[in-house]
Amino acid sequence: MHMPKGFLSFGINIGIKDDTKDFGVIYSEIPCKATAVFTKNNFPGAPVIVGKEHVRSGVLQAIVINSKNSNVATGEKGIQNSREICKIIGESLDIKETLVLPSSTGVIGVPLKMEIILPACKKAKSLLKPGNLEEVAEAIMTTDTRKKISSRNIKTKSGQGTIYGIAKGAGMIEPNMATMLCYILSDVSLPEGTDLYSILKSSVDQSFNCLTIDSDTSTSDTVALLCNGLSGESSVQDFSKALTEICIDLTKLIATDGEGATKLIELTISGAKSEAQARKIGKSILNSPLVKTAIYGGDPNWGRLIMAVGKVFDEPIPFEGLQIYFGTLPVKEANPETLKKLSEYLKNNTEISLNVVLNVGTISMKFWGCDFTEKYIEENAYYTT
């Protein structure tokens, strides 16, 4: 997997909670054109507050991330701590603190262990290495069971460039910007005047904002995009296509790694009258505990799907025209033989294709989620104990 030119990084353990990696830094040798989208939760974490201020200029050069503690609901002190982290990282890397994007993920309401984090910040420069982004992908994990990485190579005027994305997320996932963190790094540039935010927002709306694990929107969601341009200029069309593909890859990896999940669900809503209608109904289906547990248990209980469509009160769908399929098998009013095949399909596959045809329009959208198992409860009932 190709790495973008000019980015150095590291991921290490500094003992925030246990002996797994919990601290990472990404640094570009030159300032990057940058943009980001953040959580819409009304109680954003301190790093989100500071990060919004720093990305406003459209230029970033470094990202500093800690896991195992989100620095959320920590008051003014938490904001001061995020600023101090950026300041010390800036001093270590010899860049302005406003060129540093802070991120934190983990337990809410617990002050950061600054006595551990600041010494790590001070020695950041000495730890940086090229081609080391997989370490960061590991360092940002909390309840994740695997690293989440995707990349694409794209043509540039001078040859070839790379877009490389890493993400974390397994629970408290229903992004709306946009716990989910994603950092996308590229060594390409785009034509002067290109609206980088609009490009990122479009990709996020087609991917992360179509994802739900448990319907809880994190206080820390962040998707950041940094482009240093060292491999030359690409077309907006090629860049946008590759960026969206990466975001969808990472979205599916997050859904597959949902806390306790055994099955990835890819839901297609088609025949909708609008994107808003498709989004409401798609999220209603994938957020339904009854639907998610039925898929886990291999129970083709199509009444639960009818319920999930029907409970979107402001988007009534005529029952007669509604069609529902698992794979290619029709679900609605299925006979005993089809129900048996449906149960086998659900039990024997780890990737479930669910298609809901509304037949009221021409809009089609994809959404991603996962099943709901006993292990999700085990994971979250004792998270801080």
Curated annotation (Swiss-Prot):
Substrate binds at residues 142, 168, 179, 259, 380, 385. Its EC number is 2.3.1.35, 2.3.1.1. InterPro entries: Arg_biosynth_ArgJ, ArgJ-like_dom_sf, ArgJ_beta_C. The record marks 178-179 as: Cleavage. Pathway: Amino-acid biosynthesis; L-arginine biosynthesis; L-ornithine and N-acetyl-L-glutamate from L-glutamate and N(2)-acetyl-L-ornithine (cyclic): step 1/1; Amino-acid biosynthesis; L-arginine biosynthesis; N(2)-acetyl-L-ornithine from L-glutamate: step 1/4. The record marks 105-106 as: Involved in the stabilization of negative charge on the oxyanion by the formation of the oxyanion hole. Coiled coil: none annotated. GO terms for cellular component: cytoplasm. It catalyses: N(2)-acetyl-L-ornithine + L-glutamate = N-acetyl-L-glutamate + L-ornithine; L-glutamate + acetyl-CoA = N-acetyl-L-glutamate + CoA + H(+). Keywords: Acyltransferase, Amino-acid biosynthesis, Arginine biosynthesis, Autocatalytic cleavage, Cytoplasm, Multifunctional enzyme, Transferase. It comes from the Bacteria. It is found in: Cytoplasm. GO terms for biological process: L-arginine biosynthetic process; ornithine biosynthetic process. GO terms for molecular function: glutamate N-acetyltransferase activity; L-glutamate N-acetyltransferase activity. The active site is at 179 (nucleophile). Belongs to the ArgJ family. Catalyzes two activities which are involved in the cyclic version of arginine biosynthesis: the synthesis of N-acetylglutamate from glutamate and acetyl-CoA as the acetyl donor, and of ornithine by transacetylation between N(2)-acetylornithine and glutamate. Heterotetramer of two alpha and two beta chains. This is Arginine biosynthesis bifunctional protein ArgJ. It comes from Leptospira interrogans serogroup Icterohaemorrhagiae serovar copenhageni (strain Fiocruz L1-130).
